[in-house]
């Protein structure tokens, strides 16, 4: 069966749900599809279908990142339902990196929890430009306490340099929307939320004119067709027939893109912001891996040595409890993967304490496609302990 062609009529925006486990992120995602389905802007996706990977069911928590698409009168959205559990922060980092904006879900009955804070911090680190808040479970909350919860959320957002006073906070109940009970807390609140998302989350400026680059998230081999790599196009445009380089981790290789698809529909081209699959000519599944990038030939080079300006989380933010010294060996999380690196502190700096800002030199054990301004997280065994940006490339 031929694939339906994806028509691009409305501006496209990538958003997602973030927040503490069990505050209702997946229920809200389902509720949005249900309410927008009434106007033909979505196909209803039940909670179970969004929470679908087998290991998730067993634990009742969302591990994988689910992709849902829907549209409002103004925009087409690709929505990722991010993992909510602390154990899965690694997945959140890859999920949150795919967002032009996010809906922070906070249970009005419980208020901000440790992962609420962690996700706001992560959103700040991975550069999510704008957040909108949905105070969920209003059907179960004590009305007198809701105002306090709202103030608490605004303070927390301001603390992590989001404009806490200006961010829209919509109160409602995903459950009411799903069960068609209380319309004010259910359907109407969801419509209000989507209005806020439409107007408050800025239309992302797509760096379409820059040279093509797509971080590799996943690699599949499709029998009879070849190797498909998937990811979100970071910048530029990719057309069928374009030459690309596979850069990072190993020697750079040239190949040709023989097909581009999005949401399982064929495209003439993929552009910045699109989540696509690219079919590569003559490339074996084992030639490409997560952590590499596809890029316009000559536009980006792999490097192991750079100086980075970093912020090390303090203990209260879930960071280290002790200082580190020269020769510290954490993992550096670039785009989609962790690479171990050795840190050298600047002259005259004996040690770095949790909560410090410092410029460090790093030598990675494998080369990563990088240019100045590339952001990264510093992690130890899956826990984020710092964040930084490449200040200059030294080798």
UniProtKB/Swiss-Prot annotation:
Gene3D superfamilies: P-loop containing nucleotide triphosphate hydrolases, Translation factors. Keywords: Cytoplasm, Elongation factor, GTP-binding, Hydrolase, Magnesium, Metal-binding, Nucleotide-binding, Protein biosynthesis. The keyword Protein biosynthesis applies. Mg(2+) binds at residue 26. GTP binds at residues 19-26, 81-85, 136-139. It catalyses: GTP + H2O = GDP + phosphate + H(+). Residues 60-64 are annotated as: G2. The lineage of its organism: Bacteria, Pseudomonadati, Pseudomonadota, Alphaproteobacteria, Acetobacterales. It comes from the Bacteria. Residues 136-139 are annotated as: G4. Residues 81-84 are annotated as: G3. Monomer. The keyword Metal-binding applies. This is Elongation factor Tu. Its EC number is 3.6.5.3.
